């Protein structure tokens, strides 16, 4: 193993991504076209799929394998351009006002970094650009606010230079060079448009493979000096370059082949085609290079030179004429300049923002050590303009270090000087009016993989001096258009960056900044200045409304509109549930679907397996959003239902009381003699009596509420002449009559479809034909959209196909021949015209002595919930009835006669599974659904118990690998089938097994006395060979859903529907 050599190229990944980005920008080797709005984006499927869960799921779908054009209608082109630049560069430039849209798009695309972008810290504090604001305050007033890029900039030769010295520079074009050095200078003080400095290019003799460092030099700025036209931008690739006097550097710059050469465009193109070392990964939206001409008009000396330049290159130094500063090196990784769809070129380095970066001539300056190859120097392109030279201050010349082996085509060193000294300089500006104005304070730079390892530059005294003028900052900010100011999204925390106002002991206008960017972050916390600006601007921000073009819903922000369109109007549903294969718009919906439908807490979607799961904080946030949405929906429904009755809350309460009493109609109640309302609890009844002013109630006693509304609604006769127009009740006053009529009107409301009728008789007539009655749970009066939904609700909430025995009481042994049922059948059907009879609640009957019997009014069965838990004692006989009376069947008593009168308090609600008693029915429902320790659904393979059948079904998927023959064999061993009774469920405890009977009376002897319809018989063969036992729900038989799935026991109306459903289990 000693002969093995290991080499690592840390820049390979950056170079690879950079090359891919170049291909994307040029449209080469791209295999997918994304259409967003009115713009088209070319990209590579592999890159998109590796970065986004959405694209991974979209491209891996077999239906989309051959498709190369995709239209994304859930995002805006600007936001998608920012995200695409981030994918190809790992860096992001985004305005504060667009941060919410980028976050939403990152969430929709499944990019975790962008989803949590708000919690990330930007790289550099950009809101403060005091020197620029101070210098260009007058120009901001007069300028046309257009974005500009300098594409051709003049160059002044040194005073000692001659034309003969410059000729070798021009003639030296035959040798292609790795990089080009351009000395550029702008001394024109009053350009009416804000300009961005030129990218200065450097040409060196040094070859790329050498280990060397690049010295980055900023130009000199001398205030008040009219005869200092020379600005030096020097890029040297020596390992160590000590600082030299200005004269020495000018002499060195004059030498041919060092840095003063400006080759022709052809030589530049050759240089561009030569193999280059790895480059940093940056992004640009410009695809076509521009060949521009540079003209020098200084001191009577001019030259025409061709310069290959990318016009939309974003690498510029922010201009500043006042103050001087030293620039530290940002080693935080590659940076993307994506500023309103204006991006960086692939071939340039990006220096960090600085108002001025100057070359300091010092005789005894220490040498600068070389940088690590993984570092990068970055700069931000900023809006800049000129100001009068009297505003300028003295400058310092400082050396700057640039990293080696980072440039692909040419080395970019920037020089921007704003002097009013030499007006002979000519500057050509290429204006881009299509790009809106963007202030640097609206920009946040975020880079993945921050590495603040900048100790290499600590040997040199690298500082930055910023002249701060807070009043100018406020003045400059106030001149910006309102739409370009802070547009903070109310839903997101606002990350404010501070203007550093504390001064150093030497000067209160300057502060020292170390080489580490973390020091920058520490120096820019929130400031009172920005807080005041933000508060003022947010207060004056107009309330814009954004309308969905599909459903015309209105949203406060574009982020909310994007989320709504993505969730509800996106035709593509890339995320699928692994269990039932239902498709959803977002991965989060798959997650919540699996929790609610399959009882699986973890998201089983394969799209999320390749990426990190969202952090807990974000998951809690999403859960809160869903919970808040459900609460709002419930409140809206409550308010809508409460509008016709009492105003505000009282009508909603009254309607809830009506529904609650409709549910307990067969139970004992306190009946109001004024309006006929019945209450189970005395406290509720007393509270209701207070709503009837006048006499105290007469004849209040604990009786059962009869079936018919009219006899109940007739109050005690009195001498007053005020009569209710709905129920002919006579009332004592006009006010009492109005209150009573409102109560009567609410009482005549259909509990299934909420239709209101003039009289209770009309409502009762409608109830028997109401189409929503079949889909209404008679236990809690909830209405569902499908029969499967109500069946699932009855099973999971009310346990109506309960199979577990209860230890608190003993169940009588049922006669399998049907003798008990036949003998008790006539007693269980009293006369239909009987109005008042004593009824005991189903719960009391369950816990009462086995010799007692429950009497039900057959016509009032619609008010009695279908409680299949009565099957523990009662034999259920189901018969075919007409469609409009499909729900009219009721469980009938099968035990011995019961003593008349209630034997237990009706205020106790027992759990049929564990026997625990509750005083409030809501507590019982919550206990049965979530907290009950008895789990009646047993897996026959591992004998594991579950609270609901859906959790059992989800668990059973783990056993699907076993052969179905083995499963059937196990089931036959666990539960042998008797000859005279249907197969009992495979419950682990053997003693209770004979006590539990299935719902369908499919016993051979029982069928002779009590013939069952064909719908019941169809369940028998499917139940006998099922993988795990479930009693068929009574609602399924009633709804004529004759075909049951053996795995999940969902019922279907046709065999084809069952077959289609079974394909989802394969």
UniProtKB/Swiss-Prot annotation:
Give the Pro residues compositional bias ranges: 979-995
Carrying Phosphothreonine, the residues are 431
Tell me the compartments it is located in. Answer: Nucleus
- This protein is called Zinc finger and BTB domain-containing protein 21
Which residue ranges does UniProt annotate as crossing the membrane? none
Annotated Acidic residues bias: 882-891
Give the position of the cross-link Glycyl lysine isopeptide (Lys-Gly) (interchain with G-Cter in SUMO1): 40, 879
Q: In which tissues is it expressed?
A: Ubiquitous in fetal and adult tissues.
Q: One GO cellular component from the entry?
A: nucleus
The gene coding this protein: ZBTB21
> Which positions carry Phosphoserine?
345, 381, 411, 422, 434-435, 438, 605, 714, 1003
**Gene Ontology biological process:** negative regulation of DNA-templated transcription; negative regulation of transcription by RNA polymerase II; regulation of transcription by RNA polymerase II
Spans annotated as Disordered = 154-196, 388-442, 454-485, 498-525, 806-840, 879-906, 963-1014
Q: What is its main location?
A: nucleus
Q: Which PROSITE patterns match?
A: BTB, ZINC_FINGER_C2H2_1, ZINC_FINGER_C2H2_2
The record's GO molecular-function terms, alphabetically, read: DNA-binding transcription factor activity, RNA polymerase II-specific; DNA-binding transcription repressor activity, RNA polymerase II-specific; identical protein binding; methyl-CpG binding; POZ domain binding; zinc ion binding
Q: Which organism is it from?
A: Homo sapiens (Human)
